[in-house]
A protein has these predicted regions:
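Long, well-ordered, tryptophan-enriched scaffold segments
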Residues: 116, 120, 148-175
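A conserved hydrophobic secondary-structure block that centers on an alpha-helix together
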Residues: 65-131
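Stable alpha-helical elements in mature extracytoplasmic
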Residues: 1-2, 7, 106-110, 115, ...
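Conserved beta-strand scaffold positions in the cores of enzyme catalytic domains, especially
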Residues: 10, 61, 122, 151-153
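Short, solvent-exposed loop/turn segments at the edges of secondary structure
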Residues: 57, 78, 117, 146-147
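Surface-exposed loop and adjacent secondary-structure segments within mature catalytic domains
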Residues: 124-158
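Noncatalytic luminal/extracellular "stalk/propeptide" segments of secretory-pathway proteins
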Residues: 1-94
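Soluble non-cytosolic domains of exported or imported proteins
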Residues: 56, 101-109, 153-157
Length: 175
């Protein structure tokens, strides 16, 4: 209608297929701490992510700070674990989308690449320049050559906390 009103001489309405993803139930996750305590993570599923099922996903966490580090660690270290892509946005870039693009690699292709090495799930640091409790989501892309694994974004505050805890302890379990 608007195109015709604007004077376009030829307007077509054509059907097309578009991906459709529906967010499931509210996502929850936590880190199991010594003494039976837990730390609740602020997280949200990445767009296009598969769900974790009724039983969820639970495993130890391996932190990586780049795609190169993931590839260097390989299947012997990654298999059966949850990969935590802790790739912060570079605050020194004047053009914030440059930082966004570099940090976004973990979100865009991290789940597919982690699955290649046998990971059972992925957590990514939210793409935000500030430290806060609000997870930011976006989409991920899977590779049909590897299993689709659940993927979530965690808040930047929780990413900082989790990274610090991983430096202190050799094993942390996330559910």
């Amino acid at each position: 209608r608007m195109l015709k009103e604007a004077g376009a001489d030829t307007v077509y309405l054509q059907p097309c297929m578009v991906p459709h993803w529906v967010r499931g139930d509210k996502e929850t996750g936590y880190v199991k701490l010594p003494g039976g305590k837990k730390y609740d993570l602020k997280l949200t599923a990445l767009g296009n992510s598969v769900g974790s099922g009724a039983k969820g996903v639970q495993s130890s966490v391996i932190e990586v700070r780049s795609m190169a580090e993931l590839h260097d660690l390989g299947e012997n270290v990654i298999k059966g674990k949850i990969v935590f892509f802790n790739i912060p946005m570079n605050p020194t870039y004047i053009r914030s989308f440059r930082a966004y693009g570099q940090a976004g690699i973990g979100r865009r292709s991290g789940p597919a690449q982690a699955a290649k090495y046998g990971a059972i799930g992925v957590m990514v640091r939210s793409l935000a320049s500030n430290i806060d409790e609000y997870p930011h989501t976006g989409t991920t892309q899977y590779n049909d050559s590897f299993p689709k694994i659940p993927a979530v974004a965690i808040s930047t505050k929780d990413a900082e906390w989790l990274s610090g805890e991983l430096r202190k302890k050799t094993q942390l379990s996330v559910f």
